[in-house]
Regions:
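Gram-negative bacterial Sec-dependent N-terminal signal peptides
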Residues: 1-27
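Disulfide-bonded cysteine motifs in exported proteins
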Residues: 27-28, 46
C-alpha cells in the first residue's frame, strides 16, 4: 500500500480532534442534583442539568445564617434548566440568596428562579447574589412573590465588579 501524505495528515488531524473531544468531555463534570441544595466549589466546566432545588429551614431552625439553593465558588460552568426556589419560613429574617455565586463564571440556560414569602416574614435577601462573578442568562424566569411591605427581597445583588448579561 502506497503511503499517501494527504491520508496520513487527515488521519493525524482526526486523532487530534478525537483527543481534544475526550479532554473536553473529561473537563465537563456533571454535578449531582440535590433537592435541598447544591454546592459547587473549585470545579472547571461544572454542569448541573434539570434539577429542582428547594432548600428548607425548619421552623425551629436559626433565623439567621446562610440559606441557598445553589452555592458556586471559584468555579466555571453551566446551569441548564434548573428550578431553584426558596419559600421563606416565618422565623427567617436575613442572610439568604437563592443563587450565591462567588469568584465564578456561569452560564444559566433556562429554568425558573423564585422567592416566595407565604408566611409574611419580616425578611431580607437576594434571588441572585453575585460576588466578583460573571453570569450570562438565557431563557430564564426570575420571580419574587411577597406581600409583606417590611421585607426587602431583591432579584439581583452584584458585588465586587460582578457582571450579569
Amino acid at each position: 500500500m502506497k503511503n499517501n501524505k494527504i491520508f496520513n495528515r487527515t488521519f493525524k488531524i482526526s486523532l487530534v480532534t478525537a483527543a481534544l473531544g475526550l479532554v473536553n468531555s473529561a473537563l465537563a463534570a456533571d454535578v449531582a442534583c440535590n433537592s435541598s441544595g447544591v454546592t459547587i466549589t473549585g470545579q472547571s466546566g461544572a454542569v448541573l442539568n434539570q434539577c429542582s432545588i428547594n432548600p428548607t429551614s425548619p421552623t425551629n431552625g436559626p433565623e439567621w445564617g446562610s440559606l441557598s439553593a445553589v452555592k458556586m465558588t471559584n468555579s466555571s460552568g453551566q446551569l441548564n434548566n434548573v428550578n431553584a426556589s426558596l419559600s421563606i419560613p416565618a422565623n427567617r429574617h436575613s442572610s439568604f440568596a437563592v443563587m450565591n455565586i462567588t469568584n465564578s463564571t456561569t452560564e444559566i440556560n433556562g429554568g425558573i428562579y423564585s422567592i416566595t414569602n407565604p408566611n409574611n416574614a419580616d425578611s431580607s435577601g437576594y434571588l441572585f447574589e453575585l460576588n466578583n462573578s460573571t453570569v450570562t442568562m438565557h431563557n430564564s424566569k426570575v420571580l419574587i412573590s411577597d406581600s409583606n411591605q417590611d421585607s426587602i427581597l431583591e432579584a439581583f445583588a452584584l458585588n465586587q465588579k460582578s457582571k450579569l448579561t
